[in-house]
Amino acid sequence: MSKISIIICSYNRANYIGAALDALYLQSSGLENFEAIVVDNNSTDGTPEVFTTWRTHHPEGSFYYTTETKQGASFARNTGAEIAKFDWLCFIDDDAIAHKDFVQNIIRHINDQPFVHGFGGRIIPRYIPAEPKWMSYYVSSMVGNFDYAPVACAFKNGKYPLESNMIVSKKIFEQIGGFNTQLPGVVGTVRIGGEGKDLFYKIMDLGHTIYYDPTIIVEHVVETKKLTKEYMYRVASGMGRGERARTKAISQKAFVYKIIEYLFKLGAALLLGINYALQGNPAKTGPIIQFRIDTLKGLLGY
């Protein structure tokens, strides 16, 4: 039976890392089928002490703690992958709560798809205390909402799993060189995203199909008080910065095509915003348009 190395990159989530570990500890698959590696990426909020206390009260299973001082999720995830013992790598966030059959369904998917090299699952936002009235389906991707299809299927070209719930074989991960550290994620107050997209595009370029399985579920904690305009700008512009770095590394032509794509998406956002207003949901209009403006600004280097 395949076994899983679950890698949790953590940065200042002492309030949530315990819940993430609890969910793994209670997996229906049993503790013998996976290991969990917490990679602390320079936390300053007592995360090491939280892990030590948690481990004292949960001595069974294979749960490990390590550090990575180079700031950014790509560095931390690569560190976790280097020390992982098993043939499959699963990456989740430090505020992601895995459903009880999470590991069991990952193993089942691997057994059902013997030639699979990468796949991902569903991500459900867990809003605290409640979903904001201005949140829409199109903006919710910024807080991790991901529900690609109602049944297991292959991703279409241009689609891929999100970083909070993705699984790759260690062999293919090492073959492509892991996560691109030129797309590190969050470094200080600057976000340069797209590391998961870059990873899966490289796997696809090798001729492999990426799959989606909606039974592999995590809930992503979203504190609505943190969803300020400044926060949403950092996330959206970070997506654009990541695409700027990724496409420019391919060619100037790829970068120009991405600008055209983003302009098209901005136009679509304007139409969607008008539609929300006409439907009596004007609170959703501004955020969906601002999202596309901010991603375009990041793409253009602003």
Where are these regions (language model features)?
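Short, flexible, basic/aromatic active-site loop/helix in glycosyltransferases
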Residues: 121, 138-159
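Conserved donor NDP-sugar-binding/catalytic core segment of glycosyltransferases
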Residues: 101-135
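Short, well-formed alpha-helical segments that are part of the catalytic scaffolds
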Residues: 13-26
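Glycine-rich, basic loop-to-helix element that forms the pyrophosphate-binding segment
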Residues: 68-84
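A short, conserved alpha-helix in the catalytic core of glycosyltransferases
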Residues: 163-168, 172-177, 183-216
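Non-catalytic, C-terminal membrane-associated alpha-helical segments of glycosyltransferases
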Residues: 234-242, 248-302
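Short aromatic/hydrophobic "clamp" motif used to bind/position activated sugar donors
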Residues: 89
